[in-house]
Structure formats: C-alpha cells, structure tokens
C-alpha cells in the first residue's frame, strides 16, 4: 500500500469529539515513472517557487510534501489546537480501548448468532463468517467492535428493536466509547424502497451496532430485552 487516508474521528479519537483525518504516505511509489498521470507532482508548481515535488523530494517525500505545503495551504485543512489536543488524548488510550471494543464486538456477535430472532450476523471474527480466515491473518488481535445483523422479522422487527434499545444510542456514528446503533432503512437510506436497499447491500432488516466500552453483559442484556419485544 502506497498511501493510506484514515478518519481520526473514529477509533483514534474514540469519543465522538473530534473531526479530522490523517494521510500516511508509504513513500514507495515512483511518481516520475508515471509523470504523465501526475502532473501536479511531476511538473513545476508555479505557486511554490517552481518546485517539482517528485524531483526535489523523490518518491519518499513528494506526495506528503505537496499535501502539507501546497494543498493544506490552499484548502485550509488545518486542525484546531483543541482538536489536536483531544485527538492526542484519544491516541494515548487507543490500545486499551481497542481491546475492549473487539472483545465486546465478539461477545455481541456470538450472542446474536445464537438468537432465534436473528436471521444472520456479519462479523468476520465469527468462525461462520466467509471472511474469518482473512480476519485471522490480518486482524489477529481482534476484529473491531462493529457488528451488523439482520432480524428475521424484517423491516418491522428492525424498527421495534431500535425503539426498544435502552443503553445503545441511536445515531449514525461508529467507533465511539458509547454503543451506537443504526437501521439504515429508517435513517441514512430511508429514501430507498426494499429492492433498492437490498441492491445497495443494506436490506430493510439490517441493523448496524458499533459496540462501545460498556460491559459486554450490559450490552447483551439490552439487546436481549429489545429482541424480546419483537
């Protein structure tokens, strides 16, 4: 992988308090070998003393230098000092929080997989997942805290389930210290009919749950009581 961009709003912050992103440049791509495709890096930048980034900084630093020196100047994508401070606080506890997120995600996924009112569970940490082998290879320390599942009763069951949750927050956010739950059919994708939802990969019965830092027992108890109301 040559370049990776990530949202710092999610697990890095971990508390839904910061908006931001990060770019990680691996410094391995030979820009000059594909100069015709990347004129912004391989021709002089008249706005910055005529520098040709790929020649001056090589493949190790061309992209990230242009991003910080020219693009950030033009787009104004500077993070405020307060946001930077809060993000740094989140990073200091990231390794501890991720252990809990992953453990809670696995516990919730296993509970849902065994429940008769749940039609299916999407979580690569489960042995039943078609992506389990990949998760074992690339995510040996845990498969994150986000679980999606479909309720056997369809759209109506999903609606009842969402309304009956007591502990989980109903919101579109993920990767938060608090558990967040979403039914796309009634929120982010509500303009679509059932056929369109299925084609988009978010069928009407689908619920996405981002498991927070609460105790797994409390999360499962909340899920169980909501399922009982269906």
Where do the PLM segments sit?
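Short beta->alpha connector loops at strand-helix junctions that form conserved
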Residues: 6-9
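Active-site C-terminal subdomain of aminotransferase-like
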Residues: 12-146, 150-180, 185
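Short, small-residue-biased leader/transition segments that mark boundaries at the very start
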Residues: 1-3
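PLP-dependent enzyme catalytic core of the Aspartate aminotransferase-like
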Residues: 97, 163, 179-230
